Amino acid sequence: MLLKLAPAFTLLNSHGENLSPMLSTSSQGFVLKNFSTKSRNGLLVVCASKGSNTKPLTGVVFEPFEEVKKELMLVPTVPQVSLARHKYSDQCEAAVNEQINVEYNVSYVYHGMYAYFDRDNVALKGLARFFKESSEEERGHAEKLMEYQNKRGGKVKLQSILMPLSEFDHAEEGDALYAMELALSLAKLTNQKLLNLHAVATRNNDVQLADFVESKYLREQVEAIKMISEYVAQLRRVGKGHGVWHFDQMLLQEEEVVA
């Protein structure tokens, strides 16, 4: 039964409490819902109906102590097993270790380039600083991956690093252009390795690893490829002669401004 009341009407219970919030408006006044009415001695008596439902809207009640029992049984008790590891597959762990090795190898190559251009008979200080900073950046990438490996409960397994080149002079291109083209190739190779790591994470439904690779590596790698590509284009324009020195000075000044 629905009871229509005038807008100015105030409904009180036996204790004098206002029940007006229980009213919903309509075009003709107020409609009282979930209440039954009856007349007693000429007075209107309103009683709460039994149709109210206090169950959760979704029908699902979260019971943490019941649901955590399964996870509690999986907590390792052996000291050699990681306590933090959760939803981290062996494939993802191995792929992260491979990427650590890639970053260290690229860092080693860049460090060799830094040593070459810092020689007294080469003396291209701008290129030397650029490759030294690039080497430190790649090593930082490797260390960041190592930290992530430990964070996820994996084990860091360092692999061997190949000996890099020590000479970068090229008969046709010259040392500056040859080294920068090599750096561009390494940047693209690193990007491909990162894409492979992201694919492994996606294949194993590891959303956290995929997000880590996207946010910390892939965006930055695209920017590095663009920057090195511009350096290659500029070095191709200036040739092997006096223009290389001007390019090196420009590079040195840019790095000093950034620093």
From Swiss-Prot:
Residues 1-52 form a transit peptide. This is Ferritin-2, chloroplastic. The lineage of its organism: Eukaryota, Viridiplantae, Streptophyta, Embryophyta, Tracheophyta. InterPro entries: Ferritin (IPR001519), Ferritin-like (IPR012347), Ferritin-like_diiron (IPR009040), Ferritin-like_SF (IPR009078), Ferritin_CS (IPR014034), Ferritin_DPS_dom (IPR008331). Belongs to the ferritin family. PANTHER family: FERRITIN, FERRITIN-2, CHLOROPLASTIC-RELATED. It is found in: Plastid, Chloroplast. The keyword Plastid applies. The gene is FER2.
